[in-house]
């Protein structure tokens, strides 16, 4: 390309229309313009009409060709601009790919000269910040990005992954904490700025520990799980996973004493033991009477031990609200339901630690003046008599831990321990002595009168009753329900052959026939009513006749007894002896008396070996 052509090409990006043409097109265009000018002169000189028309046509063709060339050159210019933009983008991509890698670190502190201390690659370093970084906005514990010259060029978020440690205590400066990590290793860590800020919030401006819908910061407390970077020595956030929450159900139960039938005497006992000390503290102080620290509810399964414990928490909350003048609907108490078997842990010391956390949580709740019920269900599975373990001796350390919590140096103000068990003989005697579980209440199997009371909780006037049954009592629903309950209880407690269950032979040669009533429970009564309701529903679907009938209940009793024919396989012989009034007598022989059972052969029980709860 000649110099003139290069100069013409360099003018392609000019502002004049001609400067946008290539050199060849510009020359051709100039030639066309000269021809057009000549033709115009000829047209002006020629006077003939034909010559004028031909010249005008030629001029029009030349102008059309000029427009076509101009459009083609404009398109070429657009293509050139697009290519230039793509080249620039590729150059930026090449530059980006060629940049050295960036490092990350944890900000430890900001100095007065706007340098910062950063922990990166296992080292603590003092670095400078890019002018784009506002050092005043940096927060301790924050992640920062470093360039190849180890200059802070970007501020990131707080670390979201790491190890979990348990907070032991916050040190006096409020910026450091003692945490316990893996294998009970203790270390001091710095608290990231969000955690420090939560500790200095004024009263009422932070979230309640149990309100999961509140997004405000929460104050730290011992036992909390913290996300920790052990290398940088920083704790970043509180993880809402206190280990005790897996084993504890914090709730305000909705069970009242009115929901419990047939246990009036036991309810009065537990109200005297639990509610009086809470509601009349001044009288107890006046008489120098120490409130009981714990209550043991023992008896056969399914007789209402857990229901009573829940009702205590509910009633106590309402009574405390009345004393304080608060709204009964906002009554507050805590029922810590400990899942006994899940409390056990295969690692040495873990079970004891969970027990400490549970009582620590209870003390925190109770410090606010709120009653706290710590309920240990199946207490015999956790606090068994020391020295009786067959494959392990875990009870030798778990039992002392509970004893130290109940009557240790730290008092249990506003905390009551309630234990429930159907094998109270297996619980360590040190727990059952006065001063620990002071009050022991036996929840017995219901007699006929108690059974009627329990039935009345499930058979209410609101239930649909069959018209034929209502007609017998002139449509009076109350009398109908009462008659149904009486008939059902009479059938259930009748000493007839159909109700015979077992023949027990004692070591002294005495024999005794036991009936199904001797093994009745509130749970069985509820099951009978539920079966009857199901039969009534099936009758509606099959015949269209609505309503519960007495026959549905009687049939349910037969079905329930039939399902419990194997009850001897799951009942403790010592319990049978207590029911029959022959305490201390060994059972040496059992014969089932259930009619129509194919496998009703007599069965001897070897009482020399330790049978435990299950035969």
From Swiss-Prot:
* Pathway annotation: Protein degradation; proteasomal Pup-dependent pathway
What is the gene name?
A: mpa
Q: Which NCBIfam families match?
A: pup_AAA
Q: Which cysteines are joined by disulfide bonds?
A: none
* Transmembrane parts of this sequence: none
Q: Which HAMAP family match?
A: ARC_ATPase (MF_02112)
What keywords appear on the UniProt entry? ATP-binding, Chaperone, Coiled coil, Nucleotide-binding, Proteasome
Q: Which GO terms describe its biological process?
A: modification-dependent protein catabolic process; proteasomal protein catabolic process
Entries under InterPro entries matching the protein: AAA+_ATPase, AAA_ATPase_domain, ATPase_AAA_core, ATPase_AAA_CS, NA-bd_OB-fold, P-loop_NTPase, Prot_ATP_ID_OB_2nd, Prot_ATP_ID_OB_N
Spell out the SMART domains in the cross-references. Answer: AAA
Relay the domain remarks: Consists of three main regions, an N-terminal coiled-coil domain that binds to protein Pup and functions as a docking station, an interdomain involved in ARC hexamerization, and a C-terminal ATPase domain of the AAA type.
Q: Name one GO molecular function term.
A: ATP hydrolysis activity
- Any Pfam family: Prot_ATP_ID_OB_C
Q: What does this protein do?
A: ATPase which is responsible for recognizing, binding, unfolding and translocation of pupylated proteins into the bacterial 20S proteasome core particle. May be essential for opening the gate of the 20S proteasome via an interaction with its C-terminus, thereby allowing substrate entry and access to the site of proteolysis. Thus, the C-termini of the proteasomal ATPase may function like a 'key in a lock' to induce gate opening and therefore regulate proteolysis.
Q: What is this protein called?
A: Proteasome-associated ATPase
| One of the record's GO cellular component terms | proteasome complex
Stretches of the chain forming a coiled coil according to its record: 22-99
Annotated ATP binding lies at 302-307
Q: For the region Disordered, what residue ranges are annotated?
A: 1-27
User: Which intervals of the chain are annotated as region Docks into pockets in the proteasome alpha-ring?
Assistant: 614-615
Subunit and partners: Homohexamer. Assembles into a hexameric ring structure that caps the 20S proteasome core. Strongly interacts with the prokaryotic ubiquitin-like protein Pup through a hydrophobic interface; the interacting region of ARC lies in its N-terminal coiled-coil domain. There is one Pup binding site per ARC hexamer ring. Upon ATP-binding, the C-terminus of ARC interacts with the alpha-rings of the proteasome core, possibly by binding to the intersubunit pockets.
Entry similarity comment: Belongs to the AAA ATPase family.
Originating organism: Mycolicibacterium vanbaalenii (strain DSM 7251 / JCM 13017 / BCRC 16820 / KCTC 9966 / NRRL B-24157 / PYR-1) (Mycobacterium vanbaalenii)
Classification via PROSITE patterns: AAA
């Amino acid at each position: 390309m000649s110099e003139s052509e290069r100069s013409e090409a360099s003018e392609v990006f000019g502002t004049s229309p001609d400067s946008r043409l290539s050199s060849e097109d510009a020359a051709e265009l100039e030639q066309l313009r000269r021809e057009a000018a000549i033709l115009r002169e000829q047209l002006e000189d020629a006077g003939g009409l034909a010559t004028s028309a031909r010249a005008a046509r030629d001029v029009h063709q030349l102008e059309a060709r000029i427009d076509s060339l101009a459009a083609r050159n404009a398109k070429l210019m657009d293509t050139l601009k697009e290519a230039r933009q793509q080249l620039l983008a590729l150059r930026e991509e090449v530059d980006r790919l060629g940049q050295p890698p960036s490092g990350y670190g944890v900000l430890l502190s900001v100095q007065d000269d706007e340098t910062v201390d950063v922990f990166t690659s296992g080292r603590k370093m003092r670095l400078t910040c890019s002018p784009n970084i506002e050092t005043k906005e940096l927060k301790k514990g924050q992640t920062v990005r470093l360039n190849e010259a180890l200059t802070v060029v970007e501020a990131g978020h707080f670390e979201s992954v790491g190890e979990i440690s348990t907070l032991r205590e916050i040190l006096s400066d409020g910026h450091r904490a003692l945490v316990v990590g893996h294998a009970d290793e203790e270390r001091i860590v710095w608290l990231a700025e969000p955690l420090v800020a939560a500790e200095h919030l004024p009263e009422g401006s932070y979230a309640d520990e149990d309100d999961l819908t509140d997004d405000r910061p929460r104050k730290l407390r011992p036992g909390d799980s913290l996300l920790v970077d052990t290398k940088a020595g920083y704790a970043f956030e509180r993880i809402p996973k206190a280990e005790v929450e897996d084993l504890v159900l914090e709730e305000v139960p909705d069970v009242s004493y009115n929901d419990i039938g047939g246990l009036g005497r036991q309810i009065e006992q537990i109200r005297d033991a639990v509610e009086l000390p809470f509601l009349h503290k001044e009288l107890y102080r006046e008489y120098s009477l120490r409130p009981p620290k714990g209550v043991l509810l023992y008896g056969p399964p399914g007789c209402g031990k857990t229901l009573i414990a829940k009702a205590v928490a509910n009633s106590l909350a309402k009574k405390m609200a009345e004393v304080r003048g608060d709204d009964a609907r906002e009554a507050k108490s805590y029922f810590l339901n400990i899942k006994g078997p899940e409390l056990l842990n295969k690692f040495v010391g873990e079970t004891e630690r969970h027990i400490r956390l549970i009582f620590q949580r209870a003390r925190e709740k109770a410090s606010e003046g709120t009653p706290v019920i710590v309920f240990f269900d199946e207490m015999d599975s956790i606090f068994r008599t020391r020295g009786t373990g067959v494959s392990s001796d875990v009870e030798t350390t778990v039992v002392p831990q509970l004893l130290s919590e109940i009557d240790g140096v730290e008092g249990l103000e506003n905390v009551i321990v309630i234990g429930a068990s159907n094998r109270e003989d297996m619980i360590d005697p040190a727990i059952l002595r006065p001063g620990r579980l002071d009050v022991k209440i036996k929840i017995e199997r219901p007699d006929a009168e108690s059974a009627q009371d329990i039935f009345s909780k499930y058979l209410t006037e609101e239930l649909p009753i069959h018209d034929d049954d209502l007609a017998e009592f002139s449509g009076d629903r109350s009398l109908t329900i009462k008659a149904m309950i009486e008939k059902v209880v009479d059938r259930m407690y009748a000493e007839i052959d159909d109700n015979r269950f077992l023949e027990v032979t004692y070591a002294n040669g005495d024999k005794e026939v036991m009936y199904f009533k001797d093994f009745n429970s509130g749970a069985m009564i509820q099951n009978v009513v539920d079966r009857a309701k199901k039969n009534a529903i099936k009758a509606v679907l099959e015949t269209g006749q609505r309503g519960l009938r007495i026959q549905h209940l009687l049939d349910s009793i037969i079905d329930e007894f039939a399902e419990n024919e194997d009850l001897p396989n799951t009942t403790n012989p010592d319990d049978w002896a207590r029911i029959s009034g022959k305490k201390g007598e060994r059972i040496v022989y059992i014969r089932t008396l259930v009619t129509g059972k194919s496998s009703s052969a007599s069965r001897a029980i070897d009482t020399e070996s330790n049978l435990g709860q299950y035969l």
